Amino acid sequence: MENPPNETEAKQIQTNEGKKTKGGIITMPFIIANEAFEKVASYGLLPNMIMYLIRDYRFGVAKGTNVLFMWSAASNFTPLLGAFLSDSYLGRFLTISIASLSSFLGMVLLWLTAMLPQVKPSPCDPTAAGSHCGSSTASQLALLYSAFALISIGSGGIRPCSLAFGADQLDNKENPKNERVLESFFGWYYASSAVAVLIAFTGIVYIQEHLGWKIGFGVPAVLMLIAALLFILASPLYVTRGVTKSLFTGLAQAIVAAYKKRKLSLPDHHDSFDCYYHMKDSEIKAPSQKLRFLNKACLISNREEEIGSDGFALNPWRLCTTDKVEELKALIKVIPIWSTGIMMSINTSQSSFQLLQATSMDRRLSRHGSSFQVPAGSFGMFTIIALALWVILYDRAVIPLASKIRGRPFRLSVKLRMGLGLFMSFLAMAISAMVESFRRKKAISQGYANNSNAVVDISAMWLVPQYVLHGLAEALTAIGQTEFFYTEFPKSMSSIAASLFGLGMAVASLLASVVLNAVNELTSRNGKESWVSDNINKGHYNYYYWVLAIMSFINVIYYVICSWSYGPLVDQVRNGRVNGVREEEELIDIVGKGFEKEDLSPVVKTN
């Protein structure tokens, strides 16, 4: 049975019936512009921020990187909170509006740190003889961190809600072209997001490097103001939907209910349907036998005390449906594979060190006659370009060509794609270590051991391969994981499927900080120069990269084990496969067994 609409939903239905003229294509420019401007503004701040912290706030490399790790963790965690508040309390329009204003205020505060000399340490040259440069005060840091916090809160409200809010405006079941309209919107939405990030990594970074922090921080603030105004001024045009109970609440209820009934005994036969609470129209009459201790959450211990006359549970924190129990089990089941993506996110979060490398190298496009220098913070665009090219070529060229050659549909299984992405991430860190070893030797041989600001006679284009590999890793693993979650979860859990990768990035930022602090602490003992020294030529960033590369290789092996242990995917079971593979299919090895090859001819092998 389905819950009847509550009073809020009933009023909303009546309201929408009388306002059929709201929503539609006319709202799209405002919603897409809000998301795009927010991305240009926020992503444009990150690439060069380590230089701002080092030069203007006198942070060391390790401390500055840790601050950015924390900021990244907050920016990736707040979308979960934003999605919960939007679904359960505020609604999408109000959440996006508040978040847009929060981002704008945060960027204004950050701009003020560049405009007002008194809110940061006085200018000082630490290399000058007899200079004693003071560090940042608590009040100065409070203003800086407040700016970061407000920007993170803004990201947490805009990013999880914009896509869904746009779909609300176009979702008209009476329109025979509804699916096509939604597909077109999703395409434009993601295209605008990709363009926005590219503009951030090129245009905003270029402004910061050539026109200074005052204009470099002022432009994002103005863009965010435009984004907020465009979105809010179009409010009369929007369709707004009432809030509902968050899926996170339902999962929490299942955990609490299972704990409260932990002392109860489960029935001997799992097909005792009358023992378990379920909706009349539910396909799940009894929970599965995996993770059986959670089955107690839907076990009816006293029908009179737990179920009302209307058939609904009187206390959902003591008795929940079989569907909620199975949703919780599905979430727990994917956690091992989800955790394998954390290491890749740790690797891609090392942009501060990569920027310092690029700053110390020759960034001219051509070393013969060219004066244009690629901004150090713009090298991240190669990651975005590689990601976009792979997605386009895989969908438009690789799959059609392979399918034509084989005479039947072809695709790489989602497990194989995730594994290949993790292996690419390992290669990216190994290449990073080798390039840094070469750069460091060059710097020392050219007499720059004590001068971290010197430009070494080596092209920064040597950094491009590692950026490209990071892009391919994200294209394979990040997209693969999202697809994996969507296919393995029930349809009701689609919002969690979209949030899990972001949560992994938040955890990765925290763990990256732990790894960095451990390396810094262990390698600087007894007065030794830290591997992550403020002086890039005295430190050993290459050793630090090798640590990450070794961890990445171990992670690939861990993924193989998790992939093998997970068993067949939902689609494979649905298609009636035996043990998750067809008779003509075989396992593909990268570093061991565990990647199921789907729809590949036996003559095609990958080593």
From Swiss-Prot:
One Pfam family per UniProt: PTR2
GO MF entry, a single one: low-affinity nitrate transmembrane transporter activity
Family: Belongs to the major facilitator superfamily. Proton-dependent oligopeptide transporter (POT/PTR) (TC 2.A.17) family.
Protein name: Protein NRT1/ PTR FAMILY 1.2
Tissue expression as described in the entry: Expressed in shoots, stems, leaves, flowers and siliques. Mainly detected in larger expanded leaves, in the companion cells of major veins.
UniProt lineage: Eukaryota, Viridiplantae, Streptophyta, Embryophyta, Tracheophyta
InterPro entries recorded: MFS_trans_sf, POT_fam
Annotated localization: Cell membrane
Chief localization: membrane
Disruption phenotype: Nrt1.11 and nrt1.12 double mutant is defective in high-nitrate-enhanced growth.
One record GO biological process: nitrate transmembrane transport
Annotated function: Low-affinity nitrate transporter involved in xylem-to-phloem transfer for redistributing nitrate into developing leaves. Not involved in dipeptides transport.
GO CC terms, sorted: nucleus; plasma membrane
This protein's UniProt keywords: Cell membrane, Membrane, Phosphoprotein, Transmembrane, Transmembrane helix
Protein topology in the membrane: Multi-pass membrane protein
Highest taxon of the lineage: Eukaryota
Modified residues (Phosphoserine): S601
Coiled coil residues, start to end: none
Transmembrane segments: 65-85, 96-116, 138-158, 185-205, 215-235, 374-394, 418-438, 460-480, 496-516, 544-564
